[in-house]
Amino acid sequence: MRMEKTTDKPLSAGDMNDEYSRGPIDDIDCLNFFERAVQDPCCEACDTEDADEELRAKLSSFNFQPDSSPCNAKCQQTLNPLCKIDEALPAESELAPSRNGSVSEANSDTNSIASTVHDPVDSKYGGMPSLRKAKTTSYFTSSSSNNTTMRNPLKKCNTNINGLLVNGRSSSSSRQSIPELFSGACTKKKNNVLLKSETPNSEFSSNSLQHCNSRSFSLPRSRSRSSAIAIPTHLYGLEKYVSPGLDTLTADPEESIERFSNNRPREISSCCPNDTGDTSSSLSHSNTSSSLNFPLGTNTNQFHQPRQPVQQQQSSKPNFGAGRKKSFIEMSLASSFAG
């Protein structure tokens, strides 16, 4: 009876086919079918049992009669009926002949193909392998377009620089100050370069100067301070001391040296020598400013006029910078001119 079967051994594929042919499977047979690998987990035959059965079925239908081809002996030696399916087809089967050809023809064809592809000494390829690196095209399709695109920004830069240089040369010839040159640039916001035809306004008010300073323009007061021609005065800051009042030091050097040695600021002798000592003493104690404090725009002819009374000169001199102390540069200049 079926109940007397032992469940220790797993059922083979043939037994399972017999069970299917007999009729419906009982519960115990179902358990035996699903518990085959559980009963003996260390057995490898459970995994390859079905594959071996299929291989035996194929080998039973295979024709083992000898063939006329010389490759048949090699194929029979390598074909093992007990080996697995993956090992049944060796690597040498790639050279198997076709139905209409022979092995020698196939070997000759493969050798010719290999010689044409892998022959490094062939003169056709110049002694180099047939593989070549693909040429990569640049971003620009033509060289002319690349050159034009690279030259256009250079031309723009050159035109801007040339415009600035021309404006700098034209302004250096004249006596205009830099604030006057920037008046056109402050009013015209869109254009960065002054054109040749544009002439800036001669009148430059303080309001426009403050407007330019608010737009982070550091503008000097005079042209001599920022120009490259007047380098000594720009470096040492002596342009405000270069005035017609320095001529008075050459007119009367002895009296000016005495006054500088006594540390008496705001006291410089007049350009004309006096006959009486009373007038010179009264002039020394006066509160009038020295001739060094005159602005740049004063008239220089008043120092070269003929002798006049001291009272007239004292009334004609304006009182500029009465409370300013003389600097070391003024004293050194006075001593250098006096010597």
From Swiss-Prot:
Keywords: Mitochondrion, Phosphoprotein, Stress response. The modification Phosphothreonine is found at residue 159. GO terms for biological process: aerobic respiration. The modification Phosphoserine is found at residues 177, 224, 227. Disulfide bonds: none annotated. Residues 136-149, 214-224, 279-293, 302-314 have a biased composition (Low complexity). It comes from the Eukaryota. Coiled coil: none annotated. Induction: Expression is induced in the late growth phase and is negatively controlled by the cAMP-dependent protein kinase A (PKA). Residues 1-20, 94-156, 198-224, 258-325 are annotated as: Disordered. Residues 99-115, 198-213 have a biased composition (Polar residues). The keyword Protein transport does not apply. GO terms for cellular component: mitochondrion. It holds the Pfam family MBR1. It is found in: Mitochondrion. Participates in mitochondrial biogenesis and stress response. Belongs to the ISF1/MBR1 family. This is Mitochondrial biogenesis regulation protein 1. It comes from Saccharomyces cerevisiae (strain ATCC 204508 / S288c).
